[in-house]
Regions:
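A helix-coil-helix interface module used to build multimeric assemblies
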Residues: 1-180, 186-203
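Amphipathic, heptad-repeat alpha-helical segments used for oligomerization and assembly
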Residues: 206-215
Length: 215
């Protein structure tokens, strides 16, 4: 349940803001280590009350939480969400949460497969009646029947691994997916813009980002 909780969601937003600030600092923007440290010091202290009151005024969830984080981090407030758009925290967080949830399902699925394998081996010689077209057919064993369940779940595991292996972060591509805001921040340096996505992905534990997006 915690994986899908508001606390998990907004803590992940803050982790993404820290990753963005670190990346921008490493690529030469005037961001100080003091600002990074301040962000890290408050990353798990979500001030929901401040964000809620701010959202009543601005009607924007992301900007409300940028403001709330800035209240806790006055030195760093000017560099929170720098160059990014709402999808940077929204979509990336969805992908991170989906990945963590699927990994949890995978862990539980492997446990079920392990127990089924033991069950099938234990009852491999236990006779039972098999059916076809809902009619009694021929003898089989309980263990043999269990291997059918195991095979289907193994196929589910293969599908799950394929999905997990194909998931990437959105990255940070700006308002229209062109990274125009970053191109401006980096004074037209395309090489630095290209590095932004990969560096953020690595900081968040992903191999890379999707190459194109609308935002």
């Amino acid at each position: 349940q915690y994986i899908f909780s508001p606390d998990k969601k907004f803590r992940t937003w803050r982790r993404l803001w820290i990753a963005l600030a670190e990346t921008e600092k490493e690529l030469g923007l005037p961001i100080t280590q003091e600002q990074i440290d301040e962000l890290k010091a408050h990353k798990d202290e979500i001030n929901f009350d401040v964000a809620k009151e701010r959202e009543k005024l601005v009607r924007h969830d992301v900007m409300s939480h940028v403001y709330a984080y800035g209240v806790q981090c006055p030195t760093a407030k000017g560099i929170i969400h720098l160059g990014a758009t709402s999808c940077y925290v929204g979509d990336n967080t969805d992908i991170i949460i989906m990945t963590e949830a699927l990994k949890l399902v995978r862990k539980k699925l492997i446990s079920v497969l392990d127990e089924l394998a033991k069950f099938a081996d234990k009852y491999k010689a236990q006779p039972t009646l098999a059916f076809t077209h809902f009619q009694p057919a021929q003898p089989t064993t309980v263990g043999k029947r269990a291997t059918l369940w195991t095979m289907e779940l193994k196929q589910d595991l293969d599908d799950l691994d394929y999905v997990l292996g194909s998931l990437r972060l959105l990255g940070s591509k700006g308002t229209a997916g062109t990274q125009a805001s970053f191109l401006e921040l980096f004074d037209g340096d395309h090489a630095k813009c290209r590095k932004v996505d990969q560096m953020i992905a690595e900081k968040m534990g992903f191999d890379g980002c999707y190459p194109v997006s609308g935002q």
